[in-house]
Amino acid sequence: MIGSVRGSVLERLASGEVPLSDAGPEPLVAVCTHGRHDRCCADNGRPVARHLRRAGVDAWECSHVGGDRFAANVVSFPHGLFHGRVTPASALPLVHAYADGRIHPAGFRGRAAWPPAVQQAEILLRHELGEWGVEALTLTSHE
């Protein structure tokens, strides 16, 4: 049964009948609400996720993303931008900035794809330059 369903879905994807993604141009944000790992993630994250959804933002509750001490933590996709200490009041400005191609500086913790030292370097450089465009800086290499 599972094999036939899986085969059917794969055939439909390959034929183009079903798109691989229906993601639109609007950002998708994940809010850590993992209360079993650390209660503050649920206590601080759930109100943020609820506020964003009520405002029409595609906001998902997710499991642990690291940095409990920064709860509520938000990850903005597709760029994988981490923000910490997000509140319901600060959540919408963060999402609106991201939708406009900018990184909201308050609580910015770096990019998921980069190691912690590179994340810190990006944060310091952005503050120094005052440059907050998502695509404004390019990482060419790191050690």
How does the language model describe each region?
Residues M1-E143:
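Histidine/cysteine-enriched polar flanking segments
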